[in-house]
């Protein structure tokens, strides 16, 4: 073995001493989690409001007040001098929703009975835009007039179909187990020429069913949507409402605002009827039942889709869908301010079958 000669004492060498370079740790970009199903890998994406969402940025209160003058008495300035409303006040929230629908979606009549769910328009609109993205990904030349959607639990507010019709021209069927919700949603449709002929409201007569009894034998749907009941009981729902109010009160006091109303005065914006808020077993049981029923309509529905409020329910839903034979599963996380929501979409048809679906012009 040849050993390199060491220089004698005092002898110069051509070697330069090694400089002590600072150790720089290479930053690794955290990749979004992926889920592989039948050869398809799908990333869980987190983002803010969708680029096509009309509600990015601050609310234009002068314009909103112009279309709904009653809103003016509910508008105030926050400590930063920005116009806002008291989001714990049910009347304020209802009037804001009405103004947003009139200004941005051309709705001429919209109302809900007292005590029914009054969802935030920006978040619901975001959901519809991301549904559109899913469809466009599979068919970039999508003719939106061919899209037929089914909203499970349309509610008295009819928000998903309203946004879907006015933004994309989709046709809808909205189902609900509550006759009052169906009656009010139907009134909204009948009172708006933009919605007439595009939305049909159907009563689900069996509360144990989701798709059964709604999807006809010869019907085909491009996509289904749902905002499932979150709680497992009325007591859980009431506790959840009180918790939201308590958090909102603390946040408003921190910002120097007046205390907000108590639970008895704030049912509307955080409230809702039984079917809107809770069911036996809560969200996990509901979406589990939805997964099982969806398999029965695997060839009649291109994409099934539902919101999931509890992140812990996502993994179980994925595993169940895999066992049921879902060919593709998408999980998308949406960040809207401090709130993180997510939805899961699945199809029992592979990529080639989905192409054939569009060629058949559902």
UniProtKB/Swiss-Prot annotation:
A molecular function annotated in GO for this UniProt entry is: 23S rRNA (adenine(1618)-N(6))-methyltransferase activity
Q: Which GO terms describe its cellular component?
A: cytoplasm
> Which catalysed reactions does the entry list for this protein?
adenosine(1618) in 23S rRNA + S-adenosyl-L-methionine = N(6)-methyladenosine(1618) in 23S rRNA + S-adenosyl-L-homocysteine + H(+)
Q: Could you say which EC number(s) this protein's record lists? A: 2.1.1.181
Q: Which residues cross the membrane?
A: none
Question: Biased composition, Basic residues: where in the chain?
Answer: 1-28
Q: Which UniProt keywords apply?
A: Cytoplasm, Methyltransferase, rRNA processing, S-adenosyl-L-methionine, Transferase
The listed locations are: Cytoplasm
Q: What class of enzyme is it?
A: transferase
**Which SUPFAM superfamilies does this one have?**
S-adenosyl-L-methionine-dependent methyltransferases
Which InterPro entries does the record match to this protein?
METTL16/RlmF, rRNA_lsu_MeTfrase_F, SAM-dependent_MTases_sf
Specify one Pfam family.
Methyltransf_10
Question: What is the residue range of the signal peptide feature?
Answer: none
Region Disordered, residue ranges: 1-40
GO terms, biological process: rRNA base methylation
Q: What is its main location?
A: cytoplasm
**Alphabetical list of PANTHER family matching this protein:** RNA N6-ADENOSINE-METHYLTRANSFERASE METTL16, SAM-DEPENDENT METHYLTRANSFERASE
The family database entries (NCBIfam families) matched by this protein are listed as: PRK11727.1
Tell me its family: Belongs to the methyltransferase superfamily. METTL16/RlmF family.
Q: What does this protein do?
A: Specifically methylates the adenine in position 1618 of 23S rRNA.
**What name does this protein carry?**
Ribosomal RNA large subunit methyltransferase F
Q: Which organism is it from?
A: Vibrio cholerae serotype O1 (strain ATCC 39315 / El Tor Inaba N16961)
Q: What is the lineage of its organism?
A: Bacteria, Pseudomonadati, Pseudomonadota, Gammaproteobacteria, Vibrionales
Supply the gene name.
Answer: rlmF
């Amino acid at each position: 073995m040849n050993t390199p000669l060491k220089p004698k004492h005092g002898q110069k060498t051509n070697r330069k001493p090694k400089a002590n370079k600072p150790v720089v740790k290479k930053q690794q970009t955290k990749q979004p989690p992926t889920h592989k199903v039948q050869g398809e890998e799908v990333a869980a994406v987190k983002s803010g409001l969708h680029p096509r969402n009309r509600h990015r940025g601050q609310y234009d209160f002068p314009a909103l007040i112009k279309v709904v003058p009653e809103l003016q008495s509910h508008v105030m300035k926050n400590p930063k001098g920005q116009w806002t409303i008291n989001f714990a006040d049910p009347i304020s929230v209802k009037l804001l929703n009405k103004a947003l629908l009139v200004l941005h979606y051309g709705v001429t009549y919209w109302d809900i009975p007292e005590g029914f769910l009054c969802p935030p328009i920006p978040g619901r609109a975001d959901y519809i835009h991301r549904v559109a993205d899913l469809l466009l990904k599979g068919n970039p030349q999508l003719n939106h007039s061919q899209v037929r959607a089914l909203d499970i639990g349309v509610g008295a507010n009819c928000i998903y179909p309203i946004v879907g019709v006015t933004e994309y021209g989709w046709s809808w069927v909205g189902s609900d187990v509550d006759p009052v919700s169906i009656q009010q949603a139907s009134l909204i449709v009948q009172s708006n020429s933009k919605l007439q002929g595009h939305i049909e409201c159907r009563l689900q007569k069996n509360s144990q069913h989701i798709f059964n009894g709604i999807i006809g034998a010869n019907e085909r749907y491009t996509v289904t949507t749902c905002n499932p009941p979150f709680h497992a009981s009325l007591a859980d729902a009431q506790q959840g409402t009180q918790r939201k109010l308590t958090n909102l009160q603390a946040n408003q006091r921190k910002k120097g605002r007046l205390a907000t109303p108590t639970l008895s005065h704030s049912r509307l914006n955080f409230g809702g009827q039984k079917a809107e808020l809770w069911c036996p077993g809560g969200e996990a049981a509901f979406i589990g039942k939805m997964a099982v029923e969806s398999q029965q309509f695997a060839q009649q529905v291109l994409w099934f889709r539902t919101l999931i409020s509890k992140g812990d329910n996502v993994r179980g839903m994925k595993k169940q869908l895999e066992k049921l034979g879902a060919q593709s599963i998408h999980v998308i996380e949406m960040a809207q301010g401090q709130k993180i929501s997510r939805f899961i979409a699945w199809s029992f048809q592979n990529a080639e079958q989905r192409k054939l679906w569009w060629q058949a012009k559902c």
